[in-house]
């Protein structure tokens, strides 16, 4: 049976106090010492089964935010315990039932066997008694009547960091235990039984109580018919009735008499009765226990009479009711009486007859041999159980649980258990619906939300709906403008930690690499995408087709956005500030940011925008009935950075993929919980955050498709971050509330469940380019360069800092000298953790993560070379391998020679005698005819070509949009092989403009240049990608495909791109002067289908050639007639000479004809060389030269290898330049900066770029200049490629992107920077002066440039240390950055590992050979041995490195004391304690110390910064110890207690002085002048000042001298008008504290403690001795002699 009352109870436990509302209504009992508050209405609806009416006795309880965060609420309820009825809160509690009576509800239960019924009654009685005791304890605790053993002593609350009851000061291990305990003091009306009006402390106890009243017994015994309400009752039943089955309550009890064991305590007691009965049945004769008396009597009375009359002793009877034994003393009787107890502790002499008392004793534990001291408080004990109980309760918030495998520590044991699973790799919790596994059940509960469709959290600003509350809280940061995460390398800011982590990868290298093809990337999802697309063994991801056209995509969201933008256009977005319209919400957001200056998070801008937004703009259009919106909606996984209503145009991904920004990389594997610093733990669902609300949404009436994980290909690759003004870098996808369009219930899933990976706003090229008059100029001021402070010339480093660095180095080296002197002992010990060794190099570390990072990025030996799949050549960079495959691979050169690709049109070329290409025509078969390659481009594809300047000498081609010409001028369309004509221009004529077209007649461009139109013929645009027509290459950027077909297309080039290699595939037509035409790489282009024709202006001297035969002519009409008549090659198959009408049936005859009749076409280099390379055009006369050529050029042999790494090359000078990186020898330094180079060419390029800044190459379209031709090529491809839609308003330059225009404006038209307020540039009028040479500069930028060029600062590039001269810098580099030098040769290395490797390879065997040749007794035996293995060597550095591989380390032990350390510097600093050496001196005062850390600590005295602030009174100090000491004045805590007396103090030094002066009799410090002895050195120094007439403390104002520093500080106040001390009882102020104390005693005699009436102004600065003391005082008092130990 079920009870509706139980079903109506809330599901969540009351222990979740964070989920409660900030205000509660509780009914307190009548109190005698508290007032009655008025009624307060609660804003929270009650969910209790019996609503309690508001009565006059209600008490308001408020919630306060905890320290963990503003979202966590901690409720402190201040009332006392009591049992009340809902109707009458002022009534007394209900009368309790007598112990013998039972409640009516209990009698209604099912009768049980006698033993079970009695056992359950005992349980109920125990519960009643426990409840009565708890209530009584609560009342007693409220009145302060008693204190438990584990309670905190009043006044020491701040010492313990735990869960403490505010009423009775009791501590608990868990917060839930405290919350449950608080219900004793403050009864919860929701935990009151509606039948008996009894209060309980938890819902589980209330539920058990209700089940017991109803008689529902859910726990059944599997072996009998017994059933119980509680599980514990069933356990007790199993232990008592079924002994054979092991149970929690099953235990063994031994008989103290015969040691027989029993499982039941009752059986033991019955057994003990048998011993007593046996003793009573057969009583033994009583013998006198007095010495020398042999009296014995069976009669008890006679024996007692004998003792009394004979010995005068009264016998003591055993206290047991049935034991007849008699004893002489009470102690002997008590010792015997314990044998009647059933339970005896095996560890001590404790015995009892109560089983629960015996169990309680065992739980308390027993003291051990070792004293256990608490590390957080003075508690100490020998009992490990008491110690664990103390730490667990009193310091529950401390990190007391330590991982034995690593340094992880936590305050919660469950967290440690979960952490331990990291080391074992176990994931015990598995999802029942998928393969997801996790380590903690909380992770599994969060994961289960991925399988549900309920989204209970919705943003009130924009309608964003999600399943996780944490996602909503992170999402609300967008609306609040909380961009809390900022990149430390640029100005990027975002609101999510995972976005920042993804962004930081832009500043890093490519650390991830594919193991199959060496593909490198930065992000893990990129590698997964690559593996899935390139090496996935299964079927590829499915393609989602468009319902209206042939568009397909693997991303379903891209298809939906495509349909909306291209076909349906159901959702259109309008800008309220202009006429801009788009079908993509992200594009609208990007428009607002660029056109109207919207900054994400600017709420004022959003309000202004909302005021101008027309009504109804927030509502989306209603889809027509014939559309198909329902089957296109799918639930997508959402993220915190998601924005609703986002529709992404797929054309943006197709045409402008480089504009896409970074994506979310914070997905968990199998889970959607976000990663990051602040996304680590999801709060409980009961938490309520400001700015959000919790909604319980009903199920929608729309059937959605199943939720599927997006494929890996859905993640787009991150493009480089574009140049944006400061302040515009916002979070991904951030948009204001006015940008969202909540489409209603029917489409809310689409708007709320957009893929977070596609929500990033991207820019869309404007279809209407702005005119010059409309071009905005406001962005020019955005990029004004203000002179930063750090670019100013930095002052040289002070001498003290350089001295400190030198002393630190000396301290590290001095440790070896201390070992040799015998003052320090060095031993090798086995480390705690094992060492990790790299198998490919000598690298050793103790951290596994460091080894993994080294293996991925730093290991030179592990870096697997990139191998060519054809010839096996190895490369270190992907760039070198790509260049090798494109141009240099001999295998590919042989394969591609004479074997054109079937998809590229390669017309037959004329054969020149004596060339390699002439062999291709020996077969006599004509090559395949050319095929047209249509360029499938959309109408909006950005394929405009760059404009050329007007000064070009060549005539420009004009593209005409005229209709189709007459039939007579058009070519027949039914013969596609006969309508492509290639006019061949003469060599050397180049036209930088677009290749003209007229009647599909394409002139062949000259050598060395390829026109943009020719590039269009070589690629096509299909489904968002640019495809090369000559090879399988495809890409997303127009500039990439243009560069590919112009430079790197392997299929178009055929056999080679090397110098001297004959081109076999291009169409070569010899001209009249004997020159050859340049190669032609692409196929011809057909008409786009609209009938447009291109007018061609024929170049002078150009020839037209037939693409299917060698025919060529100078007139177009002759070529057209030739095509109409037909090529003879197609009919007869004869070969034609391209220079004359000669035809031949075979290729050999044609070659013989060309050699005899046209000798000018043959190579004009004299006689034919003897040897010719079969793979290239190289010729030579000697076989050795040819063999060397083939080894270097075609076989990939690199004979010159670096001895320090895997670098190899074919040139010796490259090896020498490379080796200078390792040795530092032969580096060529720059005379103007600290950089060095291996070759003079790199140095010259560096001087051109950095120092001279004299460019050598210039862009013909704008003002850009560079130092290499590649710079200009890259600039043209990126800034002038496509439509020049952005024109400069101040000059004639035009660009294809706004970013290029901004960069041009900064270069060519910079505005003078406005100086910051208060800067020197603003305060000083006129030009700026150089501080070194006095040069006048008009602007700070020019001054910085002048300083950088004329007065360069010599700075080390590795450590940024400045030097006055070039020689000092060179010496610094040799000593510091090549500090590891070989003692036997001139070798030097930057790292210690390199020197170790050098010793092993060069000098270990040599040293052994020299030792063997000396003829010593131990010849050949190395002097150094490894203590862990048989390794031997002769160099200490090698031995240390080897020992580190065993996990061992060197330990330095002081021979004067027990101090030991692993650090060489620390042992040096420690040794100075015994020697008194103090090399570190303060450069501002006479202070000196032994180690630099003390000096750094001392230097705070000379700084005014006080970063430690007291939260109580505002007191500021420089050291944290001062703040801790000051805080004890507010808390009254004195944690330092003398172990020998009751002395307590709040300072450790005061306790040390107390112990030395009060509890030490030895006076080791003696005065040499008077013979008086002292216990501390401080007292001796103070005493020595009495013998000295010197007064070292002199006032710097009046030159008055003082003997004590305090006297000078007090005197200094007389020279000021400050009165820091004041009376708290009146307005009296004084300069000294004793004056105020004297005033209080005189004028306020009623004040018990005069010191309590003294106050100090916290704003008054502290008087420091060095501020008021004269710089050259008299010499100080003589130092105390070292006559004893240090005090």
Curated annotation (Swiss-Prot):
Residues 1-23, 83-150, 613-690, 704-798, 897-935, 947-1014, 1052-1092, 1638-1687 are annotated as: Disordered. SUPFAM superfamilies: beta-beta-alpha zinc fingers. Residues 125-140 have a biased composition (Basic and acidic residues). Residues 725-739, 1082-1092 have a biased composition (Low complexity). GO terms for molecular function: DNA-binding transcription factor activity, RNA polymerase II-specific; RNA polymerase II transcription regulatory region sequence-specific DNA binding; zinc ion binding. PROSITE patterns: ZINC_FINGER_C2H2_1, ZINC_FINGER_C2H2_2. One of its GO terms (cellular component) is nucleus. Keywords: Disease variant, DNA-binding, Intellectual disability, Isopeptide bond, Metal-binding, Nucleus, Phosphoprotein, Repeat, Transcription, Transcription regulation, Ubl conjugation, Zinc, Zinc-finger. It is found in: Nucleus. SMART domains: ZnF_C2H2 (SM00355). There is a cross-link at residues 594, 1193, 1242, 1591 (Glycyl lysine isopeptide (Lys-Gly) (interchain with G-Cter in SUMO2)). The modification Phosphoserine is found at residue 154. Residues 1061-1075 have a biased composition (Polar residues). A zinc finger (C2H2-type) spans 163-185, 219-242, 253-275, 286-311, 316-340, 343-366, 372-395, 401-423, 429-451, 457-479, 485-507, 512-536, 544-567, 573-596, 1135-1158, 1171-1194, 1200-1222, 1228-1251, 1257-1280, 1286-1309, 1328-1351, 1354-1377, 1380-1403, 1424-1446, 1452-1474, 1480-1502, 1508-1530, 1536-1559, 1565-1587, 1593-1615, 1621-1643. InterPro entries: Znf-C2H2_CTCF, Znf_C2H2_sf, Znf_C2H2_type. Its main location: nucleus. GO terms for biological process: regulation of transcription by RNA polymerase II. The keyword Ubl conjugation applies. It comes from the Eukaryota. The keyword Nucleus applies. It is linked to Neurodevelopmental disorder with impaired speech and hyperkinetic movements: An autosomal recessive disorder characterized by global developmental delay, impaired intellectual development, delayed walking, poor or absent speech, and a hyperkinetic movement disorder with dystonia, tremor, ataxia, or chorea. Some patients develop seizures. Belongs to the krueppel C2H2-type zinc-finger protein family. May be involved in transcriptional regulation. This is Zinc finger protein 142.
